[in-house]
UniProtKB/Swiss-Prot annotation:
<dbReference type="Pfam" id="PF00453">
    <property type="entry name" value="Ribosomal_L20"/>
</dbReference>
<keyword id="KW-0689">Ribosomal protein</keyword>
<dbReference type="GO" id="GO:0006412">
    <property type="term" value="P:translation"/>
</dbReference>
<protein>
    <recommendedName>
        <fullName>Large ribosomal subunit protein bL20</fullName>
    </recommendedName>
</protein>
<dbReference type="GO" id="GO:0019843">
    <property type="term" value="F:rRNA binding"/>
</dbReference>
<comment type="function">
    <text>Binds directly to 23S ribosomal RNA and is necessary for the in vitro assembly process of the 50S ribosomal subunit. It is not involved in the protein synthesizing functions of that subunit.</text>
</comment>
<keyword id="KW-0687">Ribonucleoprotein</keyword>
<dbReference type="GO" id="GO:0003735">
    <property type="term" value="F:structural constituent of ribosome"/>
</dbReference>
<dbReference type="GO" id="GO:0000027">
    <property type="term" value="P:ribosomal large subunit assembly"/>
</dbReference>
<dbReference type="InterPro" id="IPR035566">
    <property type="entry name" value="Ribosomal_protein_bL20_C"/>
</dbReference>
<comment type="similarity">
    <text>Belongs to the bacterial ribosomal protein bL20 family.</text>
</comment>
<dbReference type="InterPro" id="IPR049946">
    <property type="entry name" value="RIBOSOMAL_L20_CS"/>
</dbReference>
<keyword id="KW-0694">RNA-binding</keyword>
<dbReference type="GO" id="GO:1990904">
    <property type="term" value="C:ribonucleoprotein complex"/>
</dbReference>
<dbReference type="InterPro" id="IPR005813">
    <property type="entry name" value="Ribosomal_bL20"/>
</dbReference>
<dbReference type="GO" id="GO:0005840">
    <property type="term" value="C:ribosome"/>
</dbReference>
<keyword id="KW-0699">rRNA-binding</keyword>
Length: 118
């Protein structure tokens, strides 16, 4: 039976991990064992934070809409409820952009929401 040498495979695997760990501080970018742990942990953080990013952006949009709506003496929840009653289906991302960049249109939406609540 022939002897199988796997040095090339191991070296390639180590190089791959060290390449992924490039830019890490200290031993995390130089020593395979430490770098491997750092790369795995970075992957876990990335996986978690891809999901958290969606939540955080939704929170940001809601707080922006809330700030804009409160200038018209209305609460965020009443505004959203008024839009639903008025059959205006605009998502929070777009509402947030409208509140920032086009205040006149946003005030028109607030007016429609108020009318729908009466």
């Amino acid at each position: 039976m022939a002897r199988i040498k796997r040095g090339v495979v191991a070296h390639a695997r180590h190089k791959k991990i060290l390449k992924q760990a490039k830019g890490y501080y200290g031993a995390r970018s130089r020593i395979y064992r430490v770098a491997h742990q750092a790369v795995i942990k970075a992957g876990q953080y990335a996986y978690r934070d891809r999901r958290q990013r969606k939540r955080q952006f939704r929170q940001l949009w809601i707080s922006r809409i809330n700030a804009a709506v409160r200038q018209s003496k209305m609460s965020y929840s009443n505004f959203i409820f008024g839009l639903k009653k008025a059959s205006i289906n605009i998502d929070r991302k777009i509402l947030s952009d409208i509140a920032i960049f086009d205040l006149l249109s946003f005030n028109a939406l607030v007016k429609k929401a108020k009318e729908a609540l009466l």
